[in-house]
From Swiss-Prot:
Lineage per the UniProt record: Eukaryota, Viridiplantae, Streptophyta, Embryophyta, Tracheophyta
SUPFAM superfamilies given in the database record: F-box domain
PANTHER family (UniProt xref): F-BOX DOMAIN-CONTAINING PROTEIN (PTHR44259:SF27), OS07G0183000 PROTEIN-RELATED (PTHR44259)
Cited Gene3D superfamilies: 1.20.1280.50
Name of the molecule in the record: Putative F-box protein At2g33200
Annotated organism of origin: Arabidopsis thaliana (Mouse-ear cress)
Record-linked Pfam families: Beta-prop_KIB1-4 (PF03478), F-box (PF00646)
Chain ranges of the F-box domain: 6-53
């Protein structure tokens, strides 16, 4: 007698939702990648979004869930993280690069890997031709992990579509999306900071203080000019700051409603290290400081705000109207203006202008990052 065979991918969403909501967080993120039906069902699950921390060890990762106060260890056989650097993240995915400019995407939970085209022919061949120097003298390994680079990533985990943007030394800005033959160069755009949203729109804060918007959806990137309300209204911190305030880093960010924000890491009175938020008043076209993120929260440098838990998670400062950051995002303590490596990630409370330092996962800030599982 033959046994009845069931197609688990076709379970009704009500049953799938019950199954998914009963799973541990790590298993939940693996299960939602089984098929498109399971992923769609997972989007209806009532699981809160909040930042985790990840530490890249030699051949493994440590994922810290602040709500459960638990660390999950995941082995990555065949990957040597000491030779690789994290450039950006989106949901469960990280944009990685090695010293040879080989790029790939890595899923923190499933260990799935997506290889991207090498950047060497795009950057380094051009540089050899123009300056007749070996590529290693143009891009050193330290440049890849320094503040001279910017990158962002967006990925649709249901369809597998993704888009990546990467800039180095404020000189080159490249984009690549699934289906492209190679990296594309947005020539003439000197990028200080950038943000990428689900509509394939790339927001670039440029060296001349202007904010440019590029549409990456078509065959080739195109700049949006007429419909860019920020194009002729540059943001300059020195025009909105007080004499005792000095900027360390400035990044652009996009809210869930589509508003553009400028986030500034700075040193204030008595050397207090702060974060300020600015948005443009469309009536006056002036940039004005605001005191909150409208109940959302932000990981500094990630480019997009996220829905946030209203109440503090386990006293770690993770809540609405807070900014998660890494130690090198803060104004450096050194009088020599050299960033001092902080041994941990922190959280800045916009309401009180105070910093909470969660317990450290490791002494190496260069291998420890914030990310938001399930947020894309």
């Amino acid at each position: 007698m033959s046994r009845t065979r069931y197609d688990w991918s076709k379970l009704c969403h009500d049953i799938l939702r019950l199954i998914l909501e009963s799973l541990h967080y790590k298993d939940y993120h693996r299960a939602r990648t089984v098929c498109s039906n399971w992923y769609t069902a997972s989007t209806t699950c009532k699981r809160p979004l909040y930042p985790w921390r990840i530490k890249f060890n030699k051949i493994s990762t440590s994922l810290f869930d602040p709500r459960e106060d638990k660390i999950h260890e995941i082995q990555h056989p065949g990957i040597e993280f000491s030779d690789r650097n994290v450039l950006a993240s989106c949901s469960n995915w990280f944009l990685m690069v090695d010293s040879g400019l080989e790029f790939y995407l890595l899923n923190a939970f499933t260990r799935e890997r997506i290889n991207l085209p090498s950047m060497e022919s795009s950057i380094l061949g051009k540089e050899r031709l123009e300056k007749e120097v070996a590529w290693k003298h143009f891009i050193e390994r330290t440049d890849i992990i320094s503040t001279k680079k910017q990158a962002c990533l967006w990925i649709n985990e249901r369809t597998g579509d993704y888009v990546v943007a990467w800039s180095i030394k404020q000189h080159y800005l490249f984009t690549y999306k699934k289906g492209d033959d190679s990296w594309l160069n947005l020539e003439g755009t000197k990028c200080v900071s950038m943000a990428l949203n689900k509509d394939y729109k790339l927001y670039v804060y440029a060296l001349d203080n202007s904010i440019k918007i590029f549409d990456l959806y078509g065959e080739f990137p195109s700049e949006i000019v007429e419909e860019n309300p920020y194009r002729n209204h540059p943001f300059s911190f020195r025009f909105v700051s007080k004499p005792e305030e000095h900027a360390w880093k400035q990044v652009v960010a996009i809210t869930n409603s589509g508003e553009v924000l400028m986030i500034v890491s700075l040193k204030g009175l008595e050397d207090k290290r702060l974060f300020y938020i600015y948005k443009m008043d469309f009536g006056s076209c002036n940039w004005e400081r605001v005191d909150s993120l409208g109940g959302e929260m932000l990981i500094f440098g990630h480019g997009v705000t996220i829905r946030a838990p209203i109440l503090d998670i386990n006293g770690l400062g993770i809540k609405s109207d807070s900014i998660c950051f890494r130690g090198d995002d803060l104004w450096p303590l050194s009088q020599l203006f050299i960033p001092i490596t902080q041994p941990m990630c922190g959280v800045f409370d916009l309401a009180t202008s105070t910093i909470t330092w969660p317990k450290s996962l490791d002494a190496s800030v260069l291998k420890s990052f914030w990310f938001v599982p399930g947020h894309a």
